[in-house]
Amino acid sequence: MIKENTLKIFLSNGITLTVKENEKIFIKGQEESFAELYELIATCISNKNNVEFSVEIDHEYEDENKKKKHQVVKHEYFIPSEKITWFMIEEV
């Protein structure tokens, strides 16, 4: 079994965000790296700005006829700045 890298972001308001290596991160409509997301969160906390980003997940599955299918699911995140005082990232 191949291990897939997963990064977890723990926020001070109790929310945990999980982003897997194969998921695409979008900030203001542009695809970005996990490092860019980290920088966005750090900057927003210090500047007291809201954090907005989305994650697209390409799910691959088999239908009832055993044909491979793809479904892209988009998750939008909006985190008010006053809700976050610190964050921590862990690779699992």
Feature-to-residue mapping (PLM):
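Eukaryotic intrinsically disordered, low-complexity regulatory linkers and tails enriched in Ser/Thr/Pro
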Residues: M1-V92
